[in-house]
Protein backbone atom coordinates (compact mmCIF):
# COMPACT_ATOMS: atom_id res chain seq x y z
CA UNK A 1 0.00 0.00 0.00
CA UNK A 2 1.17 3.59 -0.51
CA UNK A 3 0.98 4.15 3.27
CA UNK A 4 3.30 1.20 3.92
CA UNK A 5 5.80 2.27 1.27
CA UNK A 6 5.80 5.82 2.62
CA UNK A 7 6.31 4.59 6.19
CA UNK A 8 9.17 2.27 5.22
CA UNK A 9 10.95 4.87 3.14
CA UNK A 10 10.59 7.63 5.73
CA UNK A 11 12.34 5.46 8.30
CA UNK A 12 14.84 3.53 6.20
CA UNK A 13 15.76 5.48 3.05
CA UNK A 14 14.23 8.91 2.46
CA UNK A 15 16.06 9.43 -0.85
CA UNK A 16 15.30 5.95 -2.23
CA UNK A 17 13.67 7.20 -5.43
CA UNK A 18 16.52 9.66 -6.13
CA UNK A 19 19.75 7.67 -5.64
CA UNK A 20 21.33 4.90 -7.69
CA UNK A 21 21.73 2.38 -4.87
CA UNK A 22 24.06 4.38 -2.63
CA UNK A 23 23.11 7.58 -0.81
CA UNK A 24 26.46 9.36 -0.83
CA UNK A 25 25.09 12.23 1.31
CA UNK A 26 24.29 9.76 4.09
CA UNK A 27 27.63 8.00 3.67
CA UNK A 28 29.51 11.30 4.00
CA UNK A 29 27.42 12.24 7.04
CA UNK A 30 28.11 8.91 8.72
CA UNK A 31 31.86 9.19 8.04
CA UNK A 32 31.90 12.75 9.38
CA UNK A 33 30.01 11.68 12.51
CA UNK A 34 32.43 8.80 13.08
CA UNK A 35 35.45 11.09 12.68
CA UNK A 36 34.24 13.51 15.35
CA UNK A 37 33.06 10.77 17.69
CA UNK A 38 29.32 11.35 17.35
CA UNK A 39 26.81 8.57 17.77
CA UNK A 40 26.85 6.03 14.98
CA UNK A 41 24.18 6.36 12.32
CA UNK A 42 23.50 4.07 9.45
CA UNK A 43 24.10 5.03 5.85
CA UNK A 44 22.86 1.88 4.15
CA UNK A 45 20.12 2.40 1.63
CA UNK A 46 17.31 -0.06 1.08
CA UNK A 47 19.19 -1.30 -1.98
CA UNK A 48 22.36 -1.81 0.10
CA UNK A 49 20.35 -3.62 2.79
CA UNK A 50 18.85 -5.86 0.10
CA UNK A 51 22.36 -6.51 -1.26
CA UNK A 52 23.42 -7.54 2.24
CA UNK A 53 20.41 -9.84 2.64
CA UNK A 54 21.10 -11.49 -0.71
CA UNK A 55 24.83 -11.85 -0.01
CA UNK A 56 24.39 -13.26 3.49
CA UNK A 57 22.00 -15.88 2.15
CA UNK A 58 24.73 -17.12 -0.22
CA UNK A 59 27.98 -16.36 1.58
CA UNK A 60 29.58 -18.73 4.07
CA UNK A 61 31.79 -15.87 5.31
CA UNK A 62 29.35 -14.01 7.56
CA UNK A 63 32.16 -12.32 9.46
CA UNK A 64 33.68 -10.37 6.59
CA UNK A 65 35.41 -7.21 7.86
CA UNK A 66 33.11 -4.23 8.07
CA UNK A 67 34.74 -2.04 5.43
CA UNK A 68 35.09 -4.95 3.05
CA UNK A 69 31.43 -5.85 3.57
CA UNK A 70 30.37 -2.25 2.85
CA UNK A 71 32.40 -2.10 -0.37
CA UNK A 72 30.78 -5.37 -1.45
CA UNK A 73 27.32 -3.98 -0.57
CA UNK A 74 27.98 -0.88 -2.68
CA UNK A 75 29.01 -3.00 -5.66
CA UNK A 76 26.01 -5.31 -5.39
CA UNK A 77 23.63 -2.38 -4.80
CA UNK A 78 24.87 -0.61 -7.92
CA UNK A 79 24.36 -3.82 -9.90
CA UNK A 80 20.84 -4.24 -8.54
CA UNK A 81 20.00 -0.67 -9.53
CA UNK A 82 21.27 -1.33 -13.06
CA UNK A 83 19.21 -4.48 -13.58
CA UNK A 84 16.13 -4.07 -11.38
CA UNK A 85 13.50 -1.35 -11.21
CA UNK A 86 13.07 0.58 -7.97
CA UNK A 87 9.75 -1.19 -7.50
CA UNK A 88 11.39 -4.62 -7.86
CA UNK A 89 14.07 -3.65 -5.33
CA UNK A 90 11.48 -2.43 -2.84
CA UNK A 91 9.35 -5.55 -3.31
CA UNK A 92 12.31 -7.89 -2.79
CA UNK A 93 13.39 -5.92 0.28
CA UNK A 94 9.91 -6.07 1.83
CA UNK A 95 9.69 -9.81 1.12
CA UNK A 96 13.06 -10.61 2.72
CA UNK A 97 12.84 -8.44 5.83
CA UNK A 98 12.96 -10.11 9.23
CA UNK A 99 10.32 -8.95 11.73
CA UNK A 100 10.18 -9.97 15.37
CA UNK A 101 12.81 -12.66 14.88
CA UNK A 102 10.62 -15.40 13.46
CA UNK A 103 8.74 -13.65 10.66
CA UNK A 104 10.15 -13.13 7.19
CA UNK A 105 8.60 -10.58 4.91
CA UNK A 106 5.96 -7.94 5.21
CA UNK A 107 3.17 -10.27 4.04
CA UNK A 108 3.65 -12.79 6.87
CA UNK A 109 4.13 -10.03 9.42
CA UNK A 110 1.04 -8.14 8.32
CA UNK A 111 -1.07 -11.30 8.35
CA UNK A 112 0.10 -12.33 11.82
CA UNK A 113 -0.03 -8.94 13.54
CA UNK A 114 -2.83 -7.13 11.70
CA UNK A 115 -4.76 -10.12 10.28
CA UNK A 116 -4.77 -8.57 6.82
CA UNK A 117 -2.67 -8.25 3.69
CA UNK A 118 -0.13 -5.41 3.52
CA UNK A 119 -2.34 -3.65 0.98
CA UNK A 120 -5.05 -3.41 3.66
CA UNK A 121 -2.89 -1.72 6.31
CA UNK A 122 -3.92 1.77 7.31
CA UNK A 123 -1.38 4.57 7.77
CA UNK A 124 -0.98 4.07 11.54
CA UNK A 125 -0.50 0.30 11.20
CA UNK A 126 2.02 0.88 8.42
CA UNK A 127 4.02 3.28 10.61
CA UNK A 128 4.08 0.77 13.46
CA UNK A 129 5.34 -2.08 11.25
CA UNK A 130 8.00 0.20 9.74
CA UNK A 131 9.12 1.22 13.23
CA UNK A 132 9.71 -2.45 14.11
CA UNK A 133 12.69 -2.67 11.76
CA UNK A 134 15.54 -1.29 13.86
CA UNK A 135 14.58 -3.46 16.85
CA UNK A 136 11.95 -6.10 16.07
CA UNK A 137 11.67 -7.28 19.68
CA UNK A 138 11.08 -3.84 21.19
CA UNK A 139 8.09 -3.27 23.43
CA UNK A 140 4.91 -1.75 21.95
CA UNK A 141 5.67 1.47 23.84
CA UNK A 142 9.19 1.77 22.36
CA UNK A 143 7.94 0.98 18.85
CA UNK A 144 5.23 3.64 19.21
CA UNK A 145 7.82 6.18 20.42
CA UNK A 146 10.04 5.43 17.42
CA UNK A 147 7.09 5.73 15.02
CA UNK A 148 6.03 9.02 16.62
CA UNK A 149 9.57 10.42 16.36
CA UNK A 150 9.54 9.65 12.63
CA UNK A 151 6.31 11.64 12.22
CA UNK A 152 8.14 14.92 12.75
CA UNK A 153 9.69 14.89 9.27
CA UNK A 154 6.84 13.19 7.46
CA UNK A 155 3.95 14.51 5.43
CA UNK A 156 1.20 12.60 7.22
CA UNK A 157 -1.88 13.69 9.14
CA UNK A 158 -1.38 10.99 11.76
CA UNK A 159 -1.14 11.82 15.42
CA UNK A 160 1.01 10.11 18.01
CA UNK A 161 -2.17 8.94 19.72
CA UNK A 162 -3.25 7.07 16.58
CA UNK A 163 0.14 5.41 16.32
CA UNK A 164 0.21 4.45 20.00
CA UNK A 165 -3.24 2.88 19.64
CA UNK A 166 -2.14 0.94 16.54
CA UNK A 167 1.04 -0.25 18.29
CA UNK A 168 -0.93 -1.43 21.30
CA UNK A 169 -3.41 -3.26 19.08
CA UNK A 170 -0.79 -4.89 16.82
CA UNK A 171 1.90 -5.74 19.35
CA UNK A 172 0.08 -6.66 22.55
Predicted regions and their residues:
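Acidic helix-start/capping segments at beta-turn-to-alpha-helix junctions
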Residues: 1-5, 19-37, 43-48, 71, ...
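Short, functionally critical alpha-helical segments immediately adjacent to catalytic or ligand/cofactor-binding
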Residues: 2-33, 90-97, 126-132
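Non-catalytic, structured segments within soluble enzyme domains
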Residues: 43, 47-172
Amino acid sequence: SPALISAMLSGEDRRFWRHAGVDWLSVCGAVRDAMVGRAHRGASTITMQLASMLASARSPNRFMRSWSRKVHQVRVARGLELHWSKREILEAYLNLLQFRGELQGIRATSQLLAHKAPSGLNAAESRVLAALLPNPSASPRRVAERACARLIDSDTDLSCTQIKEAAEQLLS
